[in-house]
């Protein structure tokens, strides 16, 4: 994806009081929902400029370039803003797994009549993923 001028995009986004907006990552060709994370203005601008998805890590208090540690990068295919301007949908090409648990998606726990059920298997050990 070519670099996108971020000024108009940033003007359209309604960041919360902490300067953040939720971002949903979806596999561009299958529609699989991979994860939800937060973005700030700087991470939005970097994502649009580089085509590599960058989030804001609330726990680390800084930019989180997806895949920087694990190698499991997300390449931006499309950047969509919802009707209220307060949520972003990132259509991405995900390298490997998206979840820090080693699963393809972070949405692997299903609420079923019999209780909570894990519906996705670990594909890569987290220890291997992060070389702990």
Curated annotation (Swiss-Prot):
Cofactor binding comment, as recorded: Binds 1 Mg(2+) ion per subunit.
Cofactors required: Mg(2+); Zn(2+)
Reactions the enzyme catalyzes: 1-(5-phospho-beta-D-ribosyl)-5'-AMP + H2O = 1-(5-phospho-beta-D-ribosyl)-5-[(5-phospho-beta-D-ribosylamino)methylideneamino]imidazole-4-carboxamide
GO molecular function: magnesium ion binding; phosphoribosyl-AMP cyclohydrolase activity; zinc ion binding
Positions contributing to Mg(2+) binding: 82, 84, 86
EC primary class: hydrolase
Annotated GO biological process: L-histidine biosynthetic process
EC assignment: 3.5.4.19
Compartment(s) where it occurs, according to its Swiss-Prot or TrEMBL record: Cytoplasm
Keywords: Amino-acid biosynthesis, Cytoplasm, Histidine biosynthesis, Hydrolase, Magnesium, Metal-binding, Zinc
InterPro entries, alphabetized: PRA-CH (IPR026660), PRib_AMP_CycHydrolase_dom (IPR002496), PRib_AMP_CycHydrolase_sf (IPR038019)
Positions of disulphide bridges: none
Pathway: Amino-acid biosynthesis; L-histidine biosynthesis; L-histidine from 5-phospho-alpha-D-ribose 1-diphosphate: step 3/9
Predominant location: cytoplasm
GO CC terms of this entry: cytoplasm
Binding site for Zn(2+): 83, 99, 106
NCBIfam families, A to Z: PRK00051.1
Subunit architecture: Homodimer.
Family: Belongs to the PRA-CH family.
PANTHER family: HISTIDINE BIOSYNTHESIS BIFUNCTIONAL PROTEIN, PHOSPHORIBOSYL-AMP CYCLOHYDROLASE
Biological role stated in the UniProt entry: Catalyzes the hydrolysis of the adenine ring of phosphoribosyl-AMP.
HAMAP family per record: HisI
Protein name per the record: Phosphoribosyl-AMP cyclohydrolase
């Amino acid at each position: 994806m070519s670099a996108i001028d971020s000024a108009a995009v940033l003007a359209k986004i309604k960041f919360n009081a902490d300067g953040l907006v939720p971002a949903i990552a979806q596999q561009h060709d299958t529609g699989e929902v991979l994860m939800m994370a937060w973005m700030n203005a700087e991470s939005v601008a970097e994502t649009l400029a580089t085509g590599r998805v960058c989030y804001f890590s609330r726990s680390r208090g800084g930019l989180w370039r997806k895949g920087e540690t694990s190698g499991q990068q997300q390449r931006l295919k499309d950047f969509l803003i919802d009707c209220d301007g307060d949520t972003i949908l990132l259509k991405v090409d995900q390298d490997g797994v998206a979840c820090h648990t080693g699963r393809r998606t972070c949405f692997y726990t299903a609420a079923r009549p019999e209780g909570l059920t894990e519906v996705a298997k670990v594909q890569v050990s987290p220890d291997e993923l992060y070389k702990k």
